[in-house]
């Protein structure tokens, strides 16, 4: 059974399946099997992820002609909703996305994405490294769901340094989590999405602004050279 997730945060449980929106994991249909990408509340379920079949390729290059107009339409609406939320200063990190947009849009968006997901599964061979990709995707999804505690006062004080000003402003306005791009570089190294915490390019001066969730941090540097 094809289905789509409605949010990628662990606490925002929601899927679209059997032509209905479901917000309780206990009510997930038994036959859900194929979706676009991983969300933390899918851990433990035997699910296949179509996005991993592309191995970083642009999904637009694999959308059949008869679905391109529909996909473009729902994406324009998605961008409009995100822009409105940004202008209204509504945090998508602190709120579940499905609580911020009309249910009619969620249904329309998921219907189109289900069709694209099905097309990917039926036209592209499963990658030989799929199981590895899946484990990495799950790990990155779980990392993404962990909010980073930031000493905002310290970061603000570092804005006085011209060399640190831009990154300080980025840290103060970004989503307080790390969203990695699994296929972000040709070399296979990870990169991060824009508007999320810049963990890979963080200036050393900002390290003490990251507060531990428990007692302390342990920094481990793996050098592949």
Predicted ranges, named:
Residues 1-15, 22:
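N-terminal low-complexity regulatory segments of large eukaryotic nuclear proteins
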Residues 17-32, 37-52, 56, 63, ...:
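Acidic, glycine-rich two-metal-ion catalytic cores of nucleic acid-processing enzymes
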Residues 68, 75-78:
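Extended non-globular interaction regions in eukaryotic gene-expression and organellar proteins
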Residues 73, 87-89:
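Charged, often flexible domain-edge or linker segments that flank or initiate folded functional domains
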């Amino acid at each position: 059974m094809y289905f789509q997730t409605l949010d990628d945060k662990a606490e925002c449980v929601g899927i679209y399946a059997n032509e209905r929106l479901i917000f309780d994991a206990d009510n997930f249909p038994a036959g859900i099997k194929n979706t676009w990408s991983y969300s933390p509340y899918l851990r433990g379920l035997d699910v296949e992820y179509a996005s991993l079949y592309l191995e970083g390729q642009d999904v637009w290059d694999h959308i059949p002609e008869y679905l391109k107009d529909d996909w473009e339409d729902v994406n324009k609406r998605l961008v409009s909703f995100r822009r409105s939320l940004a202008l209204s200063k509504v945090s998508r990190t602190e709120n579940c996305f499905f609580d911020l947009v009309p249910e009619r849009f969620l249904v329309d968006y998921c219907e189109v994405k289900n069709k694209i997901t099905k097309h990917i599964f039926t036209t592209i061979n499963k990658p030989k490294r799929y199981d590895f990709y899946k484990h990495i995707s799950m790990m990155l999804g779980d990392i993404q769901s962990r909010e980073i505690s930031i000493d905002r006062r310290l970061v603000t004080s570092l804005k006085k340094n011209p060399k640190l000003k831009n990154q300080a402003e980025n840290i103060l306005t970004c989503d307080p989590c790390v969203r990695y791009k699994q296929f972000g570089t040709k070399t296979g190294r990870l990169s991060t999405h824009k508007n999320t915490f810049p963990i890979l390019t963080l200036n050393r001066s900002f390290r003490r602004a990251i507060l531990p969730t428990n007692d302390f941090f342990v920094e481990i540097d793996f050098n592949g050279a």
